[in-house]
């Protein structure tokens, strides 16, 4: 029987030490871990989950996740808690397989952030007894879409609740990696995404200070 906590330790080591953790996870994928052993099968589902070609030219959710993890590894020392940050990068789209739909030819995954919070808890609970760690990772997953919602003034924005549960800087850093971890990234696109992150921080701070949404 596989020692899940040992696998957790291996994952943790690669997430915190590798320059490109995706190489390790791609090896684990080829060896079948993500198709055979729960809860790792939750990651295997990402391979089968398509995304909008317009927003994700890199392809399925697994490809995107691997690109985000590598981006996160580049930025992890900027995080106040690299362990929580890197696990959130790995699990941030765990909710997409169950929320992805094709409507009128458009692929959507509404509320994958909310479901992702719950699935992150389910994923990590068999692997570690550190409940505060599990909760912290899950909350970062929960709020990783707020950059889009806040910058575009969407009704899903909820800055006050977000700031009660996570640090703004951590959400911004994860969002940056999420936005940059995509195919066909150009200098112009990267500059635009970084500007969006700055706007997110500024607008969130203004909302918090002014007592509005």
Model-inferred region functions:
Residues 55, 59, 107-110, 191:
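Charge-dense, low-complexity intrinsically disordered segments
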Residues 166-171, 182-211:
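Acidic, carboxylate-rich catalytic segments that either coordinate divalent cations
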Residues 1, 212-213:
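C-terminal end-of-chain micro-motif
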Residues 7, 11, 24-25, 37, ...:
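Generic structural signal of hydrophobic/aromatic residues within well-ordered alpha-helices
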Residues 1-103:
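Acidic/His-rich, divalent-metal-binding segments that scaffold phosphate/diphosphate chemistry
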Residues 71-184:
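Divalent metal-dependent catalytic cores for phosphoryl transfer on phosphate-bearing substrates
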């Amino acid at each position: 029987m596989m020692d899940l906590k040992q696998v957790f330790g291996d994952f943790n080591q690669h997430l915190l030490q590798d320059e490109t953790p995706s190489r390790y996870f791609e090896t684990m994928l080829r060896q079948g871990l993500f198709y055979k052993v729960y809860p790792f099968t939750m990651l295997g589902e990402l391979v089968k989950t398509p995304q909008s070609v317009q927003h994700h030219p890199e392809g399925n959710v697994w490809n995107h996740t691997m690109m985000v993890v590598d981006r996160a590894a580049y930025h992890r020392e900027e995080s106040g808690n690299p362990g929580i940050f890197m696990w959130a990068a790995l699990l941030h789209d765990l909710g997409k397989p169950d929320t992805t739909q094709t409507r009128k030819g458009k692929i959507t995954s509404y509320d994958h952030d909310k479901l992702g919070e719950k699935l992150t808890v389910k994923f990590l609970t068999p692997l570690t007894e550190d409940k505060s760690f599990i909760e912290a990772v899950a909350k970062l997953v929960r709020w990783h879409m707020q950059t889009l919602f806040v910058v575009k003034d969407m009704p899903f924005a909820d800055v006050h609740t977000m700031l009660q549960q996570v640090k703004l800087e951590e959400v911004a850093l994860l969002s940056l990696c999420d936005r940059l971890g995509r195919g066909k990234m150009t200098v112009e696109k990267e500059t635009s995404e970084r500007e969006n992150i700055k706007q997110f921080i500024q607008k969130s701070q203004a909302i918090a200070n002014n007592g509005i949404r």
